[in-house]
């Protein structure tokens, strides 16, 4: 019989996704067939399964931690915000519709049956399911139609472990308050607490732990220290908290423009892991100094973010940096923004708008979304800092709703292999100072990444870094380090006992 455990949090960004990945790794190491599951994920970081389905990046890296291929059943509902009030609803990997928050709240009960069926089908194939909640189960205004926290735990008939973040302060109030706001049957489902992101001497917590256990009747299963592991984040909260503003001195500095609707910033994890690269996320024009490459990332609302670039002064800063000879790269929405013209009657309804004009391209938005994994080959001749990447194989995935056509003065950057056909992708100028592509995950291709970083090194008169950094091995090491730390600081035997002896609350 399949066993299951669910991690819920006292708030967003308390570390549920990472700890769920750690449990997946531990169970995998212990020889159990393990799968992650999150019924509903709200994030702009998404990826594509081998069969072309879109799902949240968190469940993708949790699946990787479990040693299995990502499956869209692990995240049947994905919400991708397009504005402060609306989100694109992706069901079982395909776009269903756009909804505002009120409409979606009314719609959720219709999803319960489908979510339960998907969960049950997944559970039939694995020994353990590690479920993850969203935000907090104490959102009492949403409880009556909940499908992701206690509502999901009820459907799965599984125990819950509550995760609390001590780094933000008020951890005991967060634990007590969360449990106090739950119904009795829901509280009875919570079998343990993990205090996460602790810095300092854990002995200082002992008296507080004793008191919170006495007040709530729920044992604290462990105190996880703040870990220096390099793992993906589920959403933009990490960016808002300045997690990625690197300060370590490195030979190469790459600026990522932090768009308001930035998507798939996990594209840059492999870059950030390079031993000679420093990544800086930039929100203000005055911060765009002393950089070797500027990247415009993906966006869930291209024209809105393009307008922000102009209004904030970032567009002028990017163009000025480009005039000074610094290369500018765009990925997906960022690629579209680098062009001359964007025609959008779909995403924003704003019609024809001028781009930044660094690439002579025209982009037209379409109703249908392209979602596919692809293999590609970089063009045989590439200029400037990209020259060493010429002819290299790369792999990635597409998630976009537009088609970009190259005009005079632009060359194709790469050739994709799709459905047995060769398809041109991307654009690069003759001097190599503007380069764009639709391909997400490009920097996960180790040889390509080392080639372009060495191209940037050459521009500064630095010798190439001869050793190619293997990002897949790096991720595997991070999963193992996480699992090792969790075994050291959390009572994993107790979690096994909780799963094995769990009985549904009456």
From Swiss-Prot:
Q: Name one Pfam family in it.
A: CbiA
Q: What GO terms describe the biological role, i.e. biological process, of this protein?
A: cobalamin biosynthetic process
Determine if Disulfide bond is one of this entry's keywords.
no
Identify the catalytic residues. 332, 440
Q: What metabolic or biological pathway is this protein involved in?
A: Cofactor biosynthesis; adenosylcobalamin biosynthesis
- Which keywords does this chain's UniProt record carry? Cobalamin biosynthesis, Glutamine amidotransferase
By its UniProt entry, which InterPro entries does this protein fall under? Answer: Class_I_gatase-like, CobQ/CobB/MinD/ParA_Nub-bd_dom, CobQ_GATase1, CobQ_N, CobQ_synth, GATase_3, P-loop_NTPase
Per the record, the domain of life is: Bacteria
Coiled-coil intervals, chain numbering: none
PROSITE patterns attached to this UniProt entry: GATASE_COBBQ (PS51274)
UniProt cross-references to SUPFAM superfamilies, sorted A to Z = Class I glutamine amidotransferase-like, P-loop containing nucleoside triphosphate hydrolases
Enumerate the spans annotated as GATase cobBQ-type domain: 251-448
Q: Which HAMAP family match?
A: CobQ
Protein family:
Belongs to the CobB/CobQ family. CobQ subfamily.
Q: What does this protein do?
A: Catalyzes amidations at positions B, D, E, and G on adenosylcobyrinic A,C-diamide. NH(2) groups are provided by glutamine, and one molecule of ATP is hydrogenolyzed for each amidation.
Name assigned to this protein = Cobyric acid synthase
């Amino acid at each position: 019989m399949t066993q299951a455990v669910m991690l819920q949090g006292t708030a967003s960004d308390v570390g549920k996704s990472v700890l769920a990945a750690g449990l997946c790794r531990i169970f995998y190491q212990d020889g159990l067939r393990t799968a992650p599951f999150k019924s509903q994920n709200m994030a702009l970081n998404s990826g594509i399964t081998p069969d072309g389905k879109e799902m949240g990046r968190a469940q993708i890296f949790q699946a990787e931690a479990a040693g299995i291929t990502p499956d869209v059943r692990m995240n049947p509902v994905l919400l991708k915000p397009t504005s402060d009030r609306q989100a694109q609803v992706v069901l079982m990997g395909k776009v269903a519709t756009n909804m505002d928050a009120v409409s979606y709240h009314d719609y959720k009960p219709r999803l319960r049956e489908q979510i339960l069926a998907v969960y049950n089908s997944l559970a039939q194939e694995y020994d353990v399911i590690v479920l993850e909640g969203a935000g907090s189960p104490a959102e009492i205004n949403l409880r009556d139609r909940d499908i992701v926290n206690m509502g999901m735990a009820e459907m799965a008939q599984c125990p819950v472990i509550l995760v609390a973040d001590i780094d933000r302060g008020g951890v005991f109030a967060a634990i007590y308050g969360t449990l106090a706001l739950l119904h009795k049957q829901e509280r009875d489902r919570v079998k343990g607490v993990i205090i996460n992101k602790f810095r300092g001497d854990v002995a200082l917590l002992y008296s507080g732990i004793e008191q919170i256990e006495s007040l709530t009747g729920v044992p604290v299963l462990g105190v996880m220290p703040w870990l220096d592991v390099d793992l993906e984040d589920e959403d933009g909260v990490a960016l808002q908290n300045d997690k990625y503003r690197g300060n370590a001195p490195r030979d190469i500095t790459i600026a990522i423009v932090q768009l308001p609707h930035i998507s798939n910033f996990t594209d840059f994890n492999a870059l950030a892991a390079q031993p000679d690269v420093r990544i800086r996320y930039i929100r203000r024009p005055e911060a765009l100094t002393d950089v070797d490459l500027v990247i415009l990332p993906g966006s869930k609302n291209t024209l809105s973010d393009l307008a922000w670039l102009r209004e904030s002064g970032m567009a002028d800063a990017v163009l000025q940096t480009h005039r000074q000879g610094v290369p500018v790269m765009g990925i997906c929405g960022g690629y579209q923004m680098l062009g001359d013209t964007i025609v959008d009657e779909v995403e924003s309804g704003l019609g024809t708008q001028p781009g930044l004009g660094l690439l002579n391209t025209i982009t037209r938005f379409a109703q249908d979304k392209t979602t596919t994994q692809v293999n590609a080959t970089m063009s045989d001749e590439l200029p400037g800092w990209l020259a060493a990447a010429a002819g290299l194989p790369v792999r990635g995935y597409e998630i976009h709703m537009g088609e970009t056509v190259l005009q005079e003065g632009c060359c194709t950057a790469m050739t994709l292999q799709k459905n047995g056909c060769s398809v041109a992708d991307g654009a690069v100028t003759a001097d190599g100072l503007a380069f764009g592509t639709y391909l997400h995950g490009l920097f996960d291709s180790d040889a390509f990444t080392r080639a372009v970083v060495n191209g940037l090194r050459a521009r500064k008169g630095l010798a190439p870094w001869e050793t190619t950094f293997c990002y897949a091995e790096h991720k595997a090491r991070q999963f193992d380090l996480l699992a090792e730390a969790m075994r050291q600081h959390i009572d994993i035997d107790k979690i096994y006992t909780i799963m094995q002896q769990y009985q549904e609350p009456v």
